[in-house]
Structure formats: structure tokens, C-alpha cells
């Protein structure tokens, strides 16, 4: 039975309802600082912690509850006679419920405030109390989440107590929260790209219907620390998002944000199937559609500019899963909403990934993000590319780095008219891309050419300019082939494998 509760919260949502309920049930309430004042002002009987400890708050409130009369009351095991005799002899009364939420370090660390101000939002007393309560969960109810208040109220109302399994779950939530909270603080203080222990806090945003396939379970988590495009998006229309939808959105949004020009990316199964620069959103969309008018069906479309009504009217002519853009005009949104299942996503932030994580069985791989396009732009052939070819080379390299390796993209006038990827050798995607992109003049490769066969195929298909990282022991073979056929070639020094 709960006889005494300690309440100390930063987020005061729902706390009056809980405190009033506890008071009506005859529970004595202890509190500190702002929470004490809030409860008092709302007519709820409350005792200040300093009255219990006989010790005033000190050090600008850094020390409030760090006292044996508080922690002894929380940690004493009720079925342990020695524990109970000890606290009785010390004049300590048991505390049966601890209601605490922490200083909002996750939010404050992002604000434009000084380092010292951010440090002040590292909570000490709160974590100490909730860890103590969680350790002694069989005797103490610990609440850290506003969303749990009603469940606890309901259980006490119906049975007079909180069920063991509920107390255990609430205790588990404490350590789950603390691992994220401490992980964020660790990242803030260490500023280490590869710390000894990897603590990257994520908070669940929603459960997903299923994972990559229907028999797999899944959930969507947002980074608790820092920003990110997939963290801050808004869904303006359509069915709930799936696991595959979110993965595809991420890649499509990254592709279009490689460019300053108006660019549209059509994407399917996590790989671009059409990318194009246009004079306006409609023009960019139509050109991306023409890159592969088959694969775009049932895919995702991303634009890096505000989508207007003409573009929206063209998009709704076919079945699309998702349209993602930085914003939509009001009339464009009305058109898109005419397709009730079409997911319309407003992306509020540009991509900001600096690191990538890859789960392997029993371990995690961490690497810096592939954010560097080229090391150099070295023309290695007798023939130099024209300005137009050079623009298409850069365009192609920006696209090919998002295609599964081995990857080849062929480009014509700012459009990826042929995309080949996901093959275990380089000649197959080259043939595939050139077959799809008849008439293309520029070829971009995510990695070096191991043999001269790519150049031979390029010549057969009318390619006039090639961009690739270089670095093969047979680079000269490819250079000689280009010189033989009058093809210009640029080497960048940067490989873009994507597995």
C-alpha cells in the first residue's frame, strides 16, 4: 500500500491529476523546489523535502534529495527486518512511490546556449532517486513517464495497489531511460567519434505494422540526441508508413539534397530508378519519370523544391507510394490529398548524417558517412570533356553513390537515363545501364574499372565521357582504350561502394 510519495518533476503535465488522486487516497506527498511550489499553489497538501531531511537545498539546487532520509526510505526492503529496524532507529520513513522526470538535457544540448549552461541540465538528484526506486521496485513504484500516470491511478483505484509486473516494467523503463540519458551526456562530453562504449540513444516514435517482410516485427526510433531529416518530417496525408517506406524516403531525400538545382528522384527498393534536373518541379518530375517509366510505378518520388500544383497533377496520374518534399503549395496539397492512400511527407530538415551504423550478428559497425564526392577531378585522357559533359559527370557521380554496388549510371542532359546496380561484377550493370539509357553521352561508376571491358562497351554504346574513381592496377588499360576511341575520362580519387 502506498503511504508516502516523493514527487519532483521538470515536466509538470498530468502531475496535478496524479497528486490530487494520491492526496485523496491519504498518501503523504514530499516534493522539492518548483514542483513543491506548483503543488502548493494548486491547493495540494505537500511537505518540502528539506523539512524531512533537516537540510536546506544547497549549491543552487544541485543538492536537494541526496540524503539518507530520502534514499534510506526508498531503498529499504520492506521484508528485511534488519533494513526496517535500521530506518526506524534512524527516524527514516519509507517512501513507496517516486515520481520524477529529468532535466531536459536532450533538448537543451541542441540549443544555442553556453557549454556551462548545458552542463547545468545534467540531472543528478533525479537519476539517483529513480535508480534507487527501480532497484527496489518490489516495494517502490517509480514513475518517469507521464503516459504511465493513468494506468497507475487506475490500478490503485481498482485494487488499492500497483501490480508487481507493472512495477517491474516501470523499473525497466528507468534503466532504459537512463541508458539513453547517460549516452547523450557521454557523447556531449567525450566528443569522440569512436568511443570505447557505443551509446547512441534513440527513442521509439511508433510501432510499425511489420518489417521488411510481413513476418518480421518492426518499430521506428528517432535519435534522442541531435537532428536529422528522418527525425523531423511531417506526414500530411496517406496510410501509415512502413519500414520499407522510411528506408526509401531516407535515400530519396539524400539524393535530391545533393543538388542546388531543382531535382527529382524516383526510387524503388532503396535504389534510384530515375533522377533528373529540371527548370521547375513539373519539368524535373517528368524527366525523372522518363528515365524509367516502368519502375517508378509504386515507387517514391522526392523533390528538393516546393511542389506546386502542376507537378502534383502530373504525379497523381500514376500510383505512387510516397511524395516527399520540403513543402507543398496549398493547391498542390489538395491535389495530392485526392489520393487518400498516397503518403505525402514534408521534410523539415536537410540530411545531416555524419556517421552510419550497420548491425552485424552480435556486433555493430560504425563509419563516417559518405559525404565527400571527389578528391580531385583529374582528366587522364588526351581528350578533355566539354563543360556540358563535365556537368553531367558530376551529376552522375552524385547519383551513382546511392546505387547498390557494383553501380553504373549513364547520363544525358542532367538526367540519369540508365541506372544499373547491385551486381557482383562491373560489366553487367554497365551493360544494363547503357541498354536502358540509349543515347546517353556520359557514364559514371562508383568504383574503378578492373579491366578495359567497360570502355569497350561504352564505345559500342556511344558514350563520349567517363567519370570513375580510378585506382586499379589496370587503369592504363582503360585510359588507352579511351584514347583509342576518343572518349574523355576523369578520375576522382574517391570510391563510393554501397552495400
UniProtKB/Swiss-Prot annotation:
Reaction catalysis annotation: (6R)-10-formyltetrahydrofolate + 5-amino-1-(5-phospho-beta-D-ribosyl)imidazole-4-carboxamide = 5-formamido-1-(5-phospho-D-ribosyl)imidazole-4-carboxamide + (6S)-5,6,7,8-tetrahydrofolate; IMP + H2O = 5-formamido-1-(5-phospho-D-ribosyl)imidazole-4-carboxamide
Entries under Pfam families matching the protein: AICARFT_IMPCHas (PF01808), MGS (PF02142)
Record SUPFAM superfamilies: Cytidine deaminase-like (SSF53927), Methylglyoxal synthase-like (SSF52335)
This protein's GO CC annotations: cytosol
Keyword Oxidoreductase assigned: no
Pathway(s) of this molecule: Purine metabolism; IMP biosynthesis via de novo pathway; 5-formamido-1-(5-phospho-D-ribosyl)imidazole-4-carboxamide from 5-amino-1-(5-phospho-D-ribosyl)imidazole-4-carboxamide (10-formyl THF route): step 1/1; Purine metabolism; IMP biosynthesis via de novo pathway; IMP from 5-formamido-1-(5-phospho-D-ribosyl)imidazole-4-carboxamide: step 1/1
Domain of life: Bacteria
PROSITE patterns associated with the record: MGS (PS51855)
Coiled-coil regions, chain positions: none
Keywords of the record: Hydrolase, Multifunctional enzyme, Purine biosynthesis, Transferase
Domain MGS-like: from-to ranges: 1-144
Keyword Nucleotide-binding recorded: no
EC code: 2.1.2.3, 3.5.4.10
GO biological process: 'de novo' IMP biosynthetic process
SMART domains referenced in this protein's UniProt entry, alphabetically: AICARFT_IMPCHas, MGS
One MF annotation (Gene Ontology) recorded for this entry: phosphoribosylaminoimidazolecarboxamide formyltransferase activity
Record's comment describing the protein's domains: The IMP cyclohydrolase activity resides in the N-terminal region.
Family from the record: Belongs to the PurH family.
Official protein name in the record: Bifunctional purine biosynthesis protein PurH
Upper lineage: Bacteria, Bacillati, Bacillota, Clostridia, Eubacteriales
Gene: purH
Amino acid at each position: 500500500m502506498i503511504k508516502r510519495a516523493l514527487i519532483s518533476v521538470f515536466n509538470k503535465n498530468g502531475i496535478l491529476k496524479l497528486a490530487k488522486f494520491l492526496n485523496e487516497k491519504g498518501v503523504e506527498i514530499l516534493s522539492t523546489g518548483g514542483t513543491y511550489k506548483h503543488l502548493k499553489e494548486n491547493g495540494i497538501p505537500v511537505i518540502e523535502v528539506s523539512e524531512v531531511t533537516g537540510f536546506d537545498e544547497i549549491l543552487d539546487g544541485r543538492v536537494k534529495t541526496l540524503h539518507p532520509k530520502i534514499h534510506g526510505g526508498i531503498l529499504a526492503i520492506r521484508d528485511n527486518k534488519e533494513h526496517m529496524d535500521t530506518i526506524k532507529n534512524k527516524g527514516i520513513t519509507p517512501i513507496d512511490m517516486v515520481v520524477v522526470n529529468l532535466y531536459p538535457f536532450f533538448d537543451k544540448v541542441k540549443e544555442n546556449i553556453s557549454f556551462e549552461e548545458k552542463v547545468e541540465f545534467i540531472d543528478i538528484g533525479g537519476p539517483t532517486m529513480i535508480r534507487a526506486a527501480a532497484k527496489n521496485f518490489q516495494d517502490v513504484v517509480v514513475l518517469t513517464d507521464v503516459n504511465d500516470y493513468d494506468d497507475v491511478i487506475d490500478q490503485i483505484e481498482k485494487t488499492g495497489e500497483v501490480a508487481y509486473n507493472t512495477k517491474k516494467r516501470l523499473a525497466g523503463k528507468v534503466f532504459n531511460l537512463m541508458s539513453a540519458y547517460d549516452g547523450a551526456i557521454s557523447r556531449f562530453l567525450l566528443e569522440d567519434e569512436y568511443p570505447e562504449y557505443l551509446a547512441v540513444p534513440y527513442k521509439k516514435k511508433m510501432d510499425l505494422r511489420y518489417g521488411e517482410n510481413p513476418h518480421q516485427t518492426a518499430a521506428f526510433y528517432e535519435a534522442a540526441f541531435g537532428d536529422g531529416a528522418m527525425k523531423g518530417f511531417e506526414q500530411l496525408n496517406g496510410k501509415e508508413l512502413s519500414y520499407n517506406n522510411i528506408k526509401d524516403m531516407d535515400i530519396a531525400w539524400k539524393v535530391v539534397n545533393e543538388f542546388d538545382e531543382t531535382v527529382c528522384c524516383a526510387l524503388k527498393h532503396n535504389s534510384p530508378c530515375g533522377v533528373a534536373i529540371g527548370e521547375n518541379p513539373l519539368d524535373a518530375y517528368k524527366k525523372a519519370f522518363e528515365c524509367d517509366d516502368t519502375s517508378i510505378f509504386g515507387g517514391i518520388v522526392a523533390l528538393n523544391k516546393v511542389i506546386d500544383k502542376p507537378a502534383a497533377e502530373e504525379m497523381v496520374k500514376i500510383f505512387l507510394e510516397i511524395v516527399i518534399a520540403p513543402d507543398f503549395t496549398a493547391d498542390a496539397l489538395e491535389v495530392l490529398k485526392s489520393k487518400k492512400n498516397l503518403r505525402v511527407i514534408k521534410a523539415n530538415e536537410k540530411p545531416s548524417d555524419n556517421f552510419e551504423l550497420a548491425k552485424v550478428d552480435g556486433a555493430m559497425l560504425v563509419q563516417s558517412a559518405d559525404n565527400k564526392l571527389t578528391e580531385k577531378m583529374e582528366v587522364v585522357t588526351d581528350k578533355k570533356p566539354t563543360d556540358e559533359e563535365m556537368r553531367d559527370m558530376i551529376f552522375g557521380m552524385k547519383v551513382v553513390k546511392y546505387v547498390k554496388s557494383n553501380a553504373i549510371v549513364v547520363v544525358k542532359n542532367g538526367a540519369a537515363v540508365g541506372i544499373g546496380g547491385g551486381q557482383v561484377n562491373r560489366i553487367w550493370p554497365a551493360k544494363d545501364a547503357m541498354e536502358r539509357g540509349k543515347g546517353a553521352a556520359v557514364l559514371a561508376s562508383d568504383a574503378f574499372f578492373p579491366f578495359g571491358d567497360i570502355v569497350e562497351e561504352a564505345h559500342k554504346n556511344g558514350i563520349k565521357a567517363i567519370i570513375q574513381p580510378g585506382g586499379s592496377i589496370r587503369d592504363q588499360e582503360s585510359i588507352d582504350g579511351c584514347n583509342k576511341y576518343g572518349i574523355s575520362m576523369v578520375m576522382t580519387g574517391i570510391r563510393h561502394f554501397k552495400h
